[in-house]
A protein has these predicted regions:
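Amide-forming acyltransferase catalytic core, primarily the GNAT-like/NAT-type
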Residues: 4-90, 100
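Conserved acetyl-CoA-binding loop-helix of GNAT-fold acetyltransferases
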Residues: 3-4, 98-111, 131
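Short, high-confidence coil segments that cap the C-terminus of an alpha-helix
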Residues: 64, 114-117
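Conserved acetyl-CoA binding element of GNAT-fold acetyltransferases
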Residues: 87-99, 106, 116
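Residues within well-ordered alpha-helical secondary structure of globular protein domains
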Residues: 42-45, 108, 135
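Structural motif corresponding to alpha-helix initiation and N-cap regions
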Residues: 52, 103, 126-127
Length: 169
């Protein structure tokens, strides 16, 4: 693969599709209540480069809802965004320290869009992310390859339950 294209395959992403709705668990807060510097720092742990300007614009898009889970000290342990697309809604990013936190954020955001088509793009190596999607009745609709021209970044894939977008990562 690399010899022909100069790209190295890191892993596959899987897009899962389902329907929004359900009960909203308690415990998460609106992203607007989170100090932006903390959000940007948490995001930077899960993406190969700092992206504060992008992130500020991303979470403020029209038709977007973002939630975070905080620990007892007010530190972020997970956050997620769901945004309106041409057809339905897409999660991304969905980053969390544990599968339980990811599930809480997923359920909270899904509850915001009852009856709407929803998509979650998961990195295949995160088996907990794949299980989360399947547990909520989502089905795989297609896959993409995450490729790089240089070194593959050392990202905590076990904490990446939904990529920001296939185009961005």
């Amino acid at each position: 693969y690399r010899a022909r294209s100069a790209f190295t395959l890191a892993y596959r992403n899987i897009r899962f599709k389902g329907t929004g709705g359900g009960s909203e668990p308690e415990g998460s807060v609106d992203l607007g209540q989170v100090p932006f510097d903390r959000l940007a720092a948490y995001d930077a742990r899960h993406f190969p480069a700092p992206r504060p300007r992008f992130l500020a614009a991303w979470i403020r898009q029209k038709g977007t809802c973002g939630r975070a889970v905080l620990d007892d000290n007010g530190m972020i342990t997970g956050y997620g965004v769901i945004r309106k697309c041409r057809s339905g809604y897409k999660f991304g990013p969905l980053f969390a320290d544990t599968p339980e936190i990811a599930e809480e954020i997923f359920l909270t955001l899904s509850a915001q869009v009852p009856g709407e088509a929803i998509c979650l793009d998961t990195p295949e190596p995160n088996a907990e992310a794949v299980a989360l999607a399947r547990r909520h009745g989502m089905v795989a609709v297609f896959e993409t390859a995450r490729i790089y021209t240089k070194a593959i970044p050392d990202l905590p894939l076990a904490e990446i339950f939904g990529v920001t977008s296939f185009e961005v990562g």
